Amino acid sequence: VSWYAANEYCQAQGKKLPTVAQWEYVAQASETRKNGSSEKGYNQKILAWYGDSAKKPLTDIAQDKANFWGVHNMHGLIWEWTDDFNSNLVTGESRSDGSLNQGLFCGSGAAGAVDPSDYAAFMRYGFRSSLASKFALSSLGFRCAKAED
């Protein structure tokens, strides 16, 4: 599904694609805490998932345990579109790039990027690149977000 189709679908549901910050905030949660990174074993759990994922088939949607916010499958199932793409991690090199917006894209996924020493949090950042909003892939999806009531 393209970013445009995902965005239109969410709007038709009265929701929107989450921003990168919103996605990361929810992804940082463990099953019991808003910020799972302070929980013993959290980073190891994420690292183990990525280390073993190539050997295992993907799980069905919502078959894993929900995180603190009640959201399932925040890590590793597929790449996900986010609403915003103009972040400092994806803009062009401003000193020599005359067309900063030319290479921007919308795909995203991360555990969180609060602590640079938190290797698990940066693992999915490597996949936040080189995908224009008009493209669609079989491993690329989205989730819609709404304001908390």
Predicted regions and their residues:
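Short, structured beta-strand segments at or near domain termini in extracellular proteins/domains
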Residues: 136-149
